[in-house]
Amino acid sequence: MNMDRREFLKKAGLGAAVLGIGACAPRVLGDDDAKSRAVPDGKMASHYDGIGLLGYGCMRWPVIEGEDGRSHINQAEVNNLVDYALEHGVNYFDTSPVYLEGDSERATAEALNRHPRGEWLLATKLSNFSDFSYDNSVKMYRKSLEIFKTDHVDYYLLHALSGGDDFKRRFGDTGIMDFLLKERELGHIRNLGFSFHGPDSGFMEMMELHDKYHWDFVQIQMNYVDWTHSGKGNASAEFMYGELDSREIPIIIMEPLRGGRLADLPAALSDVLKAREPKNSLASWAFRFAGSFPRVKCVLSGMTYMNHLQDNLSTFLDFKPLTDEEKELLEITAEQMENYPLVRCTGCQYCMPCPYGINIPAIFKFYNGNVNAGTYVVSKEQKGYAKIRRKYLLEYNKSIPGVRQADHCISCGHCVSACPQKIAIPHELRRIDKYIETLKREDF
């Protein structure tokens, strides 16, 4: 850092807010402020011809409760979102056979197939996690083509690789990689790449395969926290970007908001960013960070609601790369986030279903939301202690049915290997359950 942190934060407008983290008052923050931003006229930002810089992640489509009492994708709303996105220059749609309990591809295809094939780019994945046999993998690939009524996939990904051994087990030894290379040669796969969750060493193993397979693109988790604070077991985005950039491999970015967490910052941190750009959402800072790197081909966002889409469009249709000073401010924000007892969950739901019925993502989301809002009890002497305690316990029971709460975890470990963020899920569930029991007993 070229500047003293206190001096820098003072210049940002609210330095004391960040430095005095423990003093933040209860306050609910989120991306609702996105509603106030108008979508400007203009052309979608782009670093590569033919592809908009903002892409649509199709893992978080809106759902409604059906007559059977279960949640179903709201197809009418998906259609509206897709229409609006295409109208404003979003043309890259990323899905997978396993998203939304296997229904994402169908819903996405139903919306997109109402438009000419040349107007949209399809990105989907070979998500052969449990059965990675040749026959099953070919079946999964052909099923995607069938669902989208197309003879080609624009961007096809080997889904969620962690390194060379994982690649060899799922794609190399099975012979499916030879099949995919032939499909690329025939033009049925226009671009072949992979998405990655794993350590530096695993990423380098995949880079060493570039000379043999010539990756057309790679999808990585990149945001201003994971740039240098990626957490135990995962390569930093800075490292991966550098390796890809040096090989001139285009990059697709996933989790630019870290599962929505960067659109819902603790009050002390959000106040600093709001002081700098009062009219802009917290999410816009994260998207400007992701879109400021020239090797980035597309930044994915799982835009569940129209206000999310409109807010992101207002960022990318009038795109302004971050200044060096703004990058420094976000690095300080990322460092300060380490001081909060948050769970690093992005809500991807790869850990689900839990064999014992625990709603893992919902528990983490509820807990993180209260930490961010300042409604996290530290001691009985805390201002508003009784009200905060009662509210937390009531809303926890209301949000998450008793049989799906953290105290039902038996530490079977079924979820651990599935987590891309390498979260020690049973440990975190025990920690949250212990906190809840402390609230009940008032034993601080």
Language-model regions, residue ranges each:
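N-terminal binding-site loop/beta-alpha segment at the start of enzyme catalytic domains
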Residues: 2-120, 179, 185
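Conserved, mostly hydrophobic/aromatic
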Residues: 56, 93, 108, 122, ...
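Conserved beta-strand positions
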Residues: 56, 95, 124, 155-158, ...
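Glycine/proline-rich, positively charged
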Residues: 64-65, 131-252, 257, 264, ...
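Structured C-terminal cap/extension of enzyme domains
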Residues: 91, 214, 239-444
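Short catalytic-loop micro-motif centered on adjacent basic/acidic residues
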Residues: 92-99, 190-195, 298-300, 419
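Short, electropositive alpha-helical surface patch
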Residues: 106-116, 208-218, 270-271, 313-319
